[in-house]
Amino acid sequence: MLAMKDKPWLLLFGLLAALSCLASFGDAAYPYYGTKIGALTRLHHGVSGDVYAVDSRTIFIKKFNYDGEAPAAYFYVGNTARPSNEGAARLRDERGGTASLTRRYRNKDVTLSLPEGKTLRDIKWFSVWCDEFAVNFGDVSIPPNLDFPRPQKISALRGVHGVSSDNIVIVDAQTLLVPNFSYDGEAPDAKFWVGRGQRPTSDGLRIPDENGKENPLRRYERKTIVLTLPEDLTIFDIGHFGVWCEAFTVDFGHVRLPEGLNVPPSLKMLGISPQSKLNCEVLYDDLAFEVRWAVAGESIVVQLVAKLEPNHYMSFGISPNKNISQMIGADAVVAWVDPQTGNGFATDYFLEGKAQCSGGRGACPDTKISEKTNSIRLLNAAMVNGYSIVTYQRSLAATDRLDLPISITGAESVVWAIGPLNDYQEVSFHTFYNKHLHQIEFGRQPKWNCPLPEGARGNSNSSEQEDSAPAAQSSTGGAGYPPAGRPNVEPDEEFYENRAEALHRQPPQRRQETAIITQRRPVPTPKPVNSNGAWDIPAIQCHEPEDGVFYAQMGPTGGKHGYPAITGHVGWGISWYINGLLIPEIHVVRGKTYTFVVEGGNNPDIPAKYHPFYISDDPVGGYEHKREEEKKAVRIYAGVHRSRSGQVTPTGVGRLCNWTPDVEGPPADDYQSFGAYQRTLTLKCDAGEPGVITWKPDRNTPDTVYYHCFTHRYLGWKIHVHDSCDSEAGGLKGAASERHEIRLPAKATVAEPAPVHEDYAGEASVRHETKVSANDNFLLKHQTDLIKNHNMNGTPPKLSFEITKSSEITKLISDGIRAAEALEESLLRNPNLNPNHPNQNPIPNPHQKPNVTPTEISSRPEILLGETHAHTLNASPSASAYPSPSATLPSANLKLPILAAGPHLIHHPPHLHRLHHQPQHAPHPHVHLHHHNLTANLPALAQKTIGLSEFLRPPQNAPLFHPVKLPGRRPFPAPIKKVPASRPILPQQHPHLHPHPQQHPVLLQQQPSLIVSHYRKPIPGLLKPFVKEKPFPLQPLAASVLLLGQPTELGGLNNKGERLKIKGKPKIPVPYVDLEPQGSLQNTAIFNQPGGKGKGDQKPKASSVSISTTPIPLVKRPTVKEPSQEEIASMRPAVNQGFKPDTVIVESGFKPIVRTDGTGVQLPKEIIDQVAHRREDPGTEIDEVMETDTLFLAAQQGGSETQSFEPMFIPSPLDSTNATKVLRVNVKEVSPTASALRLPSAALEHALPSASELIKPTLDELFAEDLNEEELEMEPMPVADDVESLEETTKKDAVTTTINIPRNTTKKPDPDLLEDLFGPDEEELYADELELDMDDRVAAAAERIDTYYLPPDNRKIPDTRVPSGALYTFDGKSVVDSSLVLPPKLDAPDNANVHQRHAQYGLTPLEQLVRTTPQFGVYRGELPQEFRGTEPQPVSEYSHPAPFSRTTPVFSSSSGSTIYPYSSSTGASTSTVSSSASSPLSSSSLRPISTKLQLLKPEGRRA
């Protein structure tokens, strides 16, 4: 409690602060005047009235009456037993006068102040006394234990956004003093807020700030402010006060107001103007410089007001000479207000001289002269309508040697000045000052000698005006100011008890039955913001996540790039994070049940940490604070419980998990992508359990609903509801893991092709790895991971290469590349065919037509690698270059295969924005067969020196570390493989045949021997740091980079003997991640070839027209026997049957879509069938070729056969870093055997010291153990125990797709047979694919781009160096969760079931759901800097391989996939681990191990 005698300046401070918002004063309707003392006894001259104690020094008389006839009547107080003038004190009248009461009072409200130094505790009675006759006209006794009103202290503010203060003081019924108030000013619509009840709601009222304005609050830094309740609102009408964000219905902090507070009534309630209690004098009228003051006990409260220029000060002080206004030696206060921040300053100065302060001399602050000498207390500062207002308090007496006392008994000479501030925020020489004597009497009765503030009404001091005023209108105050507290209906005296309320006081009750008169203003809607620069937040597609579980947590809005730019609404600081993404749009399907794990806070006492989750059709949210009419228009679908009475209670309530940004990092506005910003966030969770709600949208659910917070507005975003997940509207049209193949008709009769829809634009989609790859230091040690962990699209920047000189590798590479480069340059210079070529017979051209440059089409479709296309050169837009009957050539309906990707996932590499030049073909009567994967179609770019010699320069368009194709020949038809094309497929480029008068057969052109990149991919992000700094030193890796792929054969072109030595290529195990849907070609011969060993002389299927039988010598191939006329007549018509969906093997999540509308010319059905089922060319161990260049070169020298490799993708394992490290240890246990691609260990160590540790087991070793057919059907991986454990260890996160290999293959291939050219027939491989079908589906699921935050593994022995509850996510970020603590330390790995372990350690089913369910989706940012330079620990620190017992695959009922233990596809293993397995791997988590967990392993766990 604060007694007024101790803090008398509080009321005066409130008076001065009220002047800043005087216009808000109105009429108060509630009759509260303080504690009632009693009624005056009616003795003489009609004296009557009710006496109230306003505070310890103020008495209020309600409806005072006196006839004014007595000659010497005065107001008296005394402490004697009865009223008397002996020992009594005479009071000044309501006007401050000391004259006797000579005028008449009729129901006047009179306010009187006790003499200085006296309080109500010091007196016993109050009376109207006549001195001349010593007669008491009327009196009232004052009880000794009177509980008079006084200011009350309540709690301090504490909340979010930096809201804080010291204990708030309720000065009177309408005034609050908030000392040292702070607020960060970040919210867009924060207001001071009051209302009924104990917690803020949207039904409350905003109150003006200290300047009387209702603008959103600015930043406050420990500023003491005075707030006045508006109009007739009092503290008895409200139950709380705080800071509230009105637009978002968010409580930033509040305090409760206790009931029954005994506080003084405000001056407005007593009908007193502030001017009647304050003094004011004008100092300089031109700048409206005024000084206002009031003496309060031993101190004085002063307020300076002036219209100042920016960076100017105003000063006021006491002159050392009472007779003149002298500057030198004066004690002054210098004050100013910063217009930018609104902060005010008041500094105690001693004017030692006229110069600026220097070394304690001149006009200096007291603290610059002597420490702890500042005697000024700043109370308030404001900038109102351009006026600077500063209120401060100081003692009347001098407190140190630099101060001067202020006398209240006489006049004081004062000084003042206005001038600019210097760079040190100190005074410089004044511009305006008082040049003459100016004296002020500070102890006088309040007198307002200044212009009235705006909103104030003039005084009516004339007794004639008062007397002539009607009695009904004479209830003005003593000073003539109309009272603010004028009730509409005057209560009778019986309304109050007609006795003293000292002993039985009834505190004023809140008007619960009366509504606040102030009309509620509509809640403002945040104004729209600019959506430019919004982060690209990936939507959660309808197939993600597979289990339908969403984690809803809180996090920051992301600055101007986040919530405001995404939604168009202003964010107030926090918003929902769904699966780790900032307010993503969610796609769901009707009829499917979804689960939302809510972690938004469960403490309703702290509204800023209480965010129930619910789904409705309302785009705003905040259902709890809506009006009843607004609630009726909202339909809620999930997250609430509605009782029978209609009461709605939120159910989506759980513990609080908050994504917390780095306080020391840059602000969110500095991040250009959400991925980069997300890496700075750390998930922090309170103790407790999350809330879980389920939702199943049905046919009545609208297409768009919204997820929001039940108690706050604008925290969530949209949910799109679809009927099916397969439709484009289902969110799949842009999924990175889905590709849709369609066929569009092309019109051959029109020169310009039909425009292609932009949704079908065949451009490369962005591919996102499912795991973060290793850093650059790790790449230097593992070449295999370098090649496997790269993207598959795009072209990297041109890089420099360096190869160690004077080595055998350099010489070998130089010889091979020199020949290839020379051949490439010759073909680039001479694109036209030479009719005089020695190996090419000239062909007559009776229908020669001029060449026409093909028309560029708008799309850039993907074409088929190795597919042979026929080029038809059109002479005119309307006619074909070669006449063909329309009945046999329906080219108008020609369908082109175009691979479409979603528009938001289409990637535009730089090289795709320009078309390759088409070589000028010489006119020929036949159709050109063109291979689109040749660099002959590339523009001849200027060659630049990149660190290699002329013949060692890699191809200009080849990416770094990509296998390339060297000179070689490929027969027709080539395997079809899709690669991104940089040029469109023109109608004349599609393969079809044309009739000629000479009936020439289709020529099979030899494929030019050019270096072709089989991979088009931008440089991996993990390579960028060291690639940019310096050229990457390629010492052992150069050979594998340049020579990987099909080896160069520089022998004779027609050397059939050499080609006969090519052995059949066995099938190899390839980690299945991202393969194209392909099958195996059938061994059906297209052409009858002499000497061939085909299954039968099958006749070719004519594509569209008949073929001539005229024999023409061909290059590299014997003359084929053309079909006869009878055979041609018996052929089926060339009708385009469309692409058959049943011929597609869906792999890696790709779902081709085939449009079958219309017919057209295409390849024969046999070719299409074979291509559809074509799997990767089963080459020899290409992984071993990529292992080191030494292995590759040794195989070329030691082997007698030339291995032929088809282009093939080498996908990255889902956790390749761990896989490689484990493999390096395990391979030492395998005994190597002879292989064409292996060398003795001594040779390896001589050429490459680390190569011996990089050797993988050979194929013979991998399949050294025989398995019967039953085992083959049961296990797709027929390998030995050790090898099986190796495979499981290597690929914990991906299922390995293994192609079964016959044990003994001795058949020599015949290059003229399709069977030997493309591997086994379709029937042989189709049986293998049936066994692998389950694995393929699992691989497709594991290959998805979803990446999850996984809870900690409770089965591992905890590391003492890692704090309990801390773990690392997939990208190396720490997650702090106080509830995710590890169980007691395990002595040894046990073999108990996982669920039994959970029960043993007391895990509830809800905790199991949280720990075994992914929590957020893919992360697409860049690798943080700390991991780019992190040195990986040795393999032995965290790799302890141990053999596993043979396990039985687990079949998932949801997808029908074969799942192995320790696969990421399941949350728990159902197989039993061998009890002999003692390595940590045997008890590892059922989920994939993070690649960054190596940083947490203890040093003592080395192998």
Swiss-Prot record:
Composition skew (Low complexity), residue ranges: 830-840, 1452-1491
Keywords, sorted A to Z: Cell cycle, Cell division, Chromosome, Cytoplasm, Cytoskeleton, Meiosis, Microtubule, Mitosis, Nucleus, Repeat, Signal
Ranges of residues in domain DOMON: 287-419
Domain DM13, residue spans: 34-143, 151-258
Keyword Protease among record annotations: no
Signal peptide limits: 1-28
GO biological process: cell division; meiotic cell cycle; nucleus organization; spindle assembly
Positions of the UniProt region annotated as Disordered: 451-491, 830-857, 1086-1106, 1426-1503
GO MF annotations, alphabetized: structural molecule activity
Localization in the cell: Cytoplasm, Cytoskeleton, Spindle; Nucleus, Nucleolus; Chromosome
Pfam family for this entry, one: At5g54830
Keyword Nucleotide-binding recorded: no
Reported function: Provides structural support to stabilize and organize the microtubule spindle during mitosis (within embryonic somatic cells) and meiosis (within spermatocytes). The role in mitosis regulation depends on the Ran pathway.
Subunit structure: Interacts with Chro and Mgtor as part of a macromolecular complex forming the spindle matrix. Chro colocalizes with Skeletor (Skel) on the chromosomes at interphase and on spindle during metaphase.
Record protein name field: Protein Skeletor, isoforms D/E
Organism (species): Drosophila melanogaster (Fruit fly)
